[in-house]
């Protein structure tokens, strides 16, 4: 299992070359978290056995420091010999950003960390998420992989932003949220452990404490008469992986250049004297061994998931590269292939034979079918055959068709006049159907499959041109399609076929029978009234020969004659003139009326409101029924013929001629360079994906080198 940590270190090197957070795999590592001046740097230096970290007041660590500790035995010449043949006899360090440069002076390591930090964050106290990667090779260290983060602070200093506390907190959470990480929460012993900020942050992402280890620093600086026994034993706040106490070098020790080896010896003496029962489970040596063991077991547990993650990312990169396509070499062949693929995908979308069927919405041919049989059908059904046609309109049309002669039957001309006006109303929804199909065929350009969409992104200028060609072809076909649809309505208007089988047999015969039946009933009624009137007049005639005594000297015969005269005048007023009102009913004519020609009133343009006679009601009912039934026949014809016209002149024509039109307009040698020019973003994405894929392949090789016997 000792080989597991070097494996992770190699993986960190591989993925560090990518430099992009989204491409990183969450590797097992130890994340060091603590407040400012909590002693984090001292703990790390004690683990390494060297002074190499920047020191000072305020925030010293301003970028994440990925620290890889590699144990190299003094007699391991294979690892200590450099490529130039020199043999390294002591500890050395290497930075990722300096390449193969070797640092044997650890003061120079400190200076390089400071310079690299200032290069990115500035000379004041700004922070950055961009990590610094440092490898240290020594016979004194155990193999570890750690991340040192900026200390938690409350008040901004220098050119730090006012939200510096929030920025540092977000950075810490970003690293400790990695489920493959171990959290090393550093807290000074001379502060209340119950209010430890690192422990609080760790609880947010690791509530069960499965991957949190606490370190209690500055045990030698506690107040006289107090100790950290209860804290170290977990009685104050229990920490599942344990709480380990350490003693750091004081600032005076550092100024006096006290060696870390001597400081570790003094730490052991302090532990034996102050905490004899806990000495074996505290101190820097125990912390290093404990971290090494925890990290190895953690890597062992994470390795299967790590293998799976690398495989998944590798497959995704391969898929992305296929989508991005190979760099264009033969532009003639590439252009023809793209045109052919697009035309095939467009045709498949119309016919419903595409491999990737849309499941969230109707598109292509299915949407055209929906327009024909649902949208267009409902639109025609919503047209009322008698809408905007009143009884007065019908009656006026009947009378205008008869001219000066009263009609015995309903004139056919009035029916044709009225039904044509209603048929004309079918033209608007028919043209709207053409428009909807045209819009859908334009929209289908965006629904031609994943491959086509990727090529749209890769060659935006080419697909702008393809869109223009498709729009042009559709626009060309729109005019003849509209003309044919208008002609279909005009054909129905040109000839009203009253001999249509559905119209003649079902309607005219029935209406004729009803009209004859009504005439027969009215005739018998008139005969009965006439016979009764004759008998009354005969009896009255015999009686009027005799003088009739009056009342108060009034002759009743004279009164009857006067009433008869008034009755005749009233009947005259209900004749032809009565149709225009009762202006002629009065027996006296005013001087103004005598000034008009023939002493007749002005004829109004429309009839005044009155109750229709039974004959008029019958005529109106006949016309309404004829219009309704014939309109339904025409509506069926239009509902059937308009979709056929659209399919013939628009849909099928575009489907059959699109590819040849694309080749004719786009296959031009002088324009190929412009059409097949990739966006810079697409080229960069291909390069990034190739780099990621190369790193993943290296990672896969590294992981495959770990034998199962080593892991378990």
UniProtKB/Swiss-Prot annotation:
Subunit and partners: Interacts (via residues 280-502) with caspase ced-9; the interaction is enhanced by GTP rather than GDP; the interaction is probably direct and may occur at the mitochondrion.
Tissue expression as described in the entry: Highly expressed in neurons, in intestinal cells and in the body wall, pharyngeal, and vulval muscles.
Disruption phenotype: RNAi-mediated knockdown causes embryonic lethality; onset of lethality is delayed by 12 hr in a caspase ced-3 mutant background. Extremely disorganized gonads, including many nuclei without mitochondria, large clusters of mitochondria without nuclei and cells without either nuclei or mitochondria. Substantial increase in mean lifespan in age-1 mutant background. Substantial increase in mean lifespan in daf-2 mutant.
Record region (G4 motif): 217-220
Pfam family, one: Dynamin_N
Lineage of the organism: Eukaryota, Metazoa, Ecdysozoa, Nematoda, Chromadorea
Free-text function comment from the UniProt entry: Functions in mitochondrial division. Functions in peroxisomal division. Mediates membrane fission, perhaps mainly of the mitochondrial outer membrane. Mitochondrial fission may be promoted by recruitment to mitochondrial membranes via the egl-1/ced-9 complex. Involved in the coordination of mitochondrial division with autophagy in response to acute heat stress during larval development.
InterPro entries per record: Dynamin, Dynamin_GTPase, Dynamin_GTPase_CS, Dynamin_N, Dynamin_stalk, G_DYNAMIN_dom, GED, GED_dom
Keywords assigned by UniProt, alphabetized: Apoptosis, Cytoplasm, Developmental protein, GTP-binding, Hydrolase, Lipid-binding, Membrane, Mitochondrion, Mitochondrion outer membrane, Nucleotide-binding
Region (G2 motif): 60-62
Chain intervals for the UniProt region annotation (Disordered): 523-542
Descriptive protein name: Dynamin-1-like protein drp-1
Predominant location category: mitochondrion
Protein species of origin: Caenorhabditis elegans
Substrates-to-products reaction catalysed: GTP + H2O = GDP + phosphate + H(+)
Compartments in which it is found: Mitochondrion; Mitochondrion outer membrane; Cytoplasm, Cytosol
GO molecular function list: GTP binding; GTPase activity; lipid binding; microtubule binding
Origin superkingdom: Eukaryota
Domain GED: 620-711
An annotated GO cellular component: cytosol
Dynamin-type G domain mapped to chain residues: 24-304
Gene Ontology biological process terms, A to Z: apoptotic mitochondrial changes; apoptotic process; embryo development ending in birth or egg hatching; endocytosis; intracellular distribution of mitochondria; mitochondrial fission; peroxisome fission
UniProt region (Interaction with caspase ced-9), positions on chain: 280-502
Region (G5 motif): 247-250
Membrane-spanning segments: none
Chain spans, region G3 motif: 148-151
Region of interest called G1 motif, as start-end residue ranges on this chain: 34-41
Family classification: Belongs to the TRAFAC class dynamin-like GTPase superfamily. Dynamin/Fzo/YdjA family.
């Amino acid at each position: 299992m000792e080989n597991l940590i070097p494996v992770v270190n190699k993986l960190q090197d591989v993925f560090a070359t990518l430099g992009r957070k989204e491409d990183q795999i969450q590797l097992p590592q130890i994340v060091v978290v603590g407040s400012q001046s909590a002693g984090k740097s001292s703990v790390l230096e004690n683990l390494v056995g060297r002074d190499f970290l920047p020191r000072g007041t305020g925030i010293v660590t301003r970028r994440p420091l990925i620290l890889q500790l590699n144990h190299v035995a003094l007699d391991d010449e294979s690892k200590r010999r450099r490529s130039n043949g020199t043999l390294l006899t002591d500890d050395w360090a290497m930075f990722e950003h300096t390449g193969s440069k070797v640092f044997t002076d650890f003061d120079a390591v400190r200076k390089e960390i400071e310079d690299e930090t200032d290069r990115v964050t500035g000379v004041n106290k700004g922070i950055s998420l961009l990590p610094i990667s440092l490898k240290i090779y020594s016979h004194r260290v155990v193999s570890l992989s750690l991340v040192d983060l900026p200390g938690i602070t409350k008040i901004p200093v220098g050119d730090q932003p006012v939200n510096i506390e929030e920025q540092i907190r977000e950075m810490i959470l970003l690293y400790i949220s990695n489920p493959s990480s171990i959290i090393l929460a550093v807290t000074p012993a001379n502060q209340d452990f119950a209010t430890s900020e690192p422990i609080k942050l760790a609880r947010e992402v690791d509530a069960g404490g499965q991957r949190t280890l606490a370190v209690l620093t500055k045990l030698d600086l506690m107040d006289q008469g107090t100790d950290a026994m209860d804290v170290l034993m977990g009685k104050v706040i229990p920490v599942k992986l344990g709480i380990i106490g350490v003693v750091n070098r004081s600032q005076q020790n550092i100024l006096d250049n006290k060696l870390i080896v001597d400081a570790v010896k003094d730490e052991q003496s302090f532990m034996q004297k102050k905490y004899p029962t806990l000495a074996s489970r505290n101190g820097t040596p125990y912390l290093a061994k404990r971290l090494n063991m925890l990290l190895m077991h953690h890597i062992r547990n994470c390795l299967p998931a790590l293998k799976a993650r690398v495989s998944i990312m590798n497959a995704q990169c391969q898929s992305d590269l296929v989508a991005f396509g190979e760099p264009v070499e033969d532009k003639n062949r590439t252009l023809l292939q793209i045109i052919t693929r697009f035309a095939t995908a467009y045709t498949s979308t119309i016919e419903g034979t595409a491999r990737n069927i849309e499941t969230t919405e109707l598109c292509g041919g299915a949407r055209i079918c929906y327009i024909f049989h649902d949208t267009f059908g409902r639109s025609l059904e919503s047209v009322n055959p008698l809408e905007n046609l009143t009884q007065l309109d019908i009656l006026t049309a009947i009378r205008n068709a008869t001219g000066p002669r009263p009609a015995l039957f309903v004139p056919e001309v009035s029916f044709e006049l009225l039904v044509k006006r209603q048929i004309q109303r079918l033209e608007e929804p028919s043209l709207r159907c053409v428009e909807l199909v045209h819009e859908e065929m334009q929209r289908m350009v965006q629904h031609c499959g994943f491959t086509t969409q990727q090529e749209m992104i890769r060659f935006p200028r080419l697909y702008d041109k393809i869109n223009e060609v498709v729009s042009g072809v559709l626009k060309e076909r729109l005019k003849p399609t509209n003309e044919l649809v208008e002609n279909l309505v005009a054909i129905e208007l040109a000839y009203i076929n009253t001999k249509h089988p559905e119209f003649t047999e079902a309607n005219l015969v029935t209406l004729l029978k009803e009209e004859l039946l009504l005439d027969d009933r009215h005739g018998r009624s008139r005969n009965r009234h006439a016979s009764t009137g004759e008998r009354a007049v005969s009896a009255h005639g015999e009686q009027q020969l005799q003088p009739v005594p009056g009342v108060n000297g009034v002759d009743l015969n004279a009164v009857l004659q006067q009433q008869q005269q008034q009755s005749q005048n009233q009947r005259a007023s209900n004749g032809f003139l009565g149709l225009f009102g009762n202006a002629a009913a009065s027996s006296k004519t005013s001087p103004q009326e005598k000034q008009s020609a023939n002493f007749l009133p002005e004829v109004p343009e429309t009839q005044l409101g009155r109750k229709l006679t039974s004959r008029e009601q019958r005529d109106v009912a006949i016309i309404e029924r004829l219009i309704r039934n014939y309109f339904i026949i025409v509506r069926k014809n239009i509902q059937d013929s308009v979709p056929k016209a659209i399919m013939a002149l628009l849909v099928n024509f575009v489907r059959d001629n699109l590819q040849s039109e694309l080749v004719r307009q786009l296959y031009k040698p002088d324009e190929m360079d412009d059409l097949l020019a990739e966006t810079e973003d697409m080229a960069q994405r291909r390069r990034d994906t190739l780099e990621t894929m190369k790193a993943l392949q290296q990672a896969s090789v590294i992981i495959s080198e770990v034998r199962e016997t080593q892991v378990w």
